Amino acid sequence: VEKERYQEREISSTYVREELRLGHMETVNVLLGRPYSIYGIVSKGKQLGRQLNLPTLNIYPPDSKLLPPNGVYASITRLDGKEYFGVTNLGVRPTLDDSPLLSVETNLFDYNDDAYGHYIEVQLMHFLRQEMKFDSIETLKKQMESDASFAKEMFLLKN
């Protein structure tokens, strides 16, 4: 039986891990045959996203989970049997508190309910940019709005 190939390369777990470490989510998702996902129970954060009118669902991946680079991703989140488009930050929140704890914070488009304690699946679809420290909360908010606008265009959603 001949091995499956993608982009002239044999598909293997090594190939998937290499692409994941580079943040090449489209390739990872093709190689896996499904979207790369991070799962978890929504935890209450510091409510800073809510104060910025950009609320997030926060989960904490297990240390054993192989993750792509810290950064911002266009994402699809499965919650209570429905799928929501959004933007996810994977990282340590350098502008807010530079937490040593890695978190996955997802702002969903068109979702405003309380999801604390709910199990979610966050599918990372496209790497948008590296995580970075901003000079102010206002600059961070403007960038988050820009990230959301870009992701909506990617998903062909109206603003």
Where are the predicted features?
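Phosphate/ribose-recognition catalytic cores of enzymes acting on nucleotide-derived substrates
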Residues: 44-159
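Classical nucleotidyltransferase
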Residues: 1-55, 78, 135-139
